[in-house]
Design a protein with these regions (language model features):
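Terminal alpha-helical anchor/extension segments at protein ends
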Residues: 1-126
């Protein structure tokens, strides 16, 4: 399925990517694997592997709205900007949210992208 928009809900343990167009919705979940070692007791390595998997899953999606808690957003944004700068132009925005359902996320994203596309002068594909 070719989609133009996606919304990512991320926290430190999991991520959900909802790709959508006017008629279709496709969901993908990514979970963090926690494997603390004596050498990497802080879990930074695990977090980086998790964020890398999320960035890989976002590859090829033209516009993504990233949602989540403020700390989850800040940490993912820092990782993406530092380690995956090619992804930055595809991230349309960051929106803090609590724990919305998938339909609530899609509704939020549709509203966001309608505003975003109009401001950018980009026609939204139908």
């Amino acid at each position: 399925m070719t989609t133009f928009h996606a919304v990512l809900r991320i926290d430190h343990q999991s991520a959900e990517i909802l790709q959508f167009d006017a008629e279709h919705l496709e969901s993908q979940r990514i979970k963090a694997h926690t494997h603390h070692t004596a050498r990497h007791a802080s879990g930074v390595r695990s977090e980086h592997e998790f964020y890398a998997a999320v960035c890989d899953a976002l590859a090829g999606i033209p516009e993504v709205l990233v949602t989540g808690s403020k700390t989850g957003l800040a940490d993912f944004r820092h990782y993406a900007e530092k380690h995956r700068p090619a992804l930055a132009p595809h991230i349309a925005g960051y929106e803090p949210v609590d724990h919305p359902t998938a339909p609530q996320l899609v509704a939020l994203a549709r509203k966001f992208f309608l505003r975003h596309d109009r401001m950018a002068g980009t026609p939204t594909p139908s």
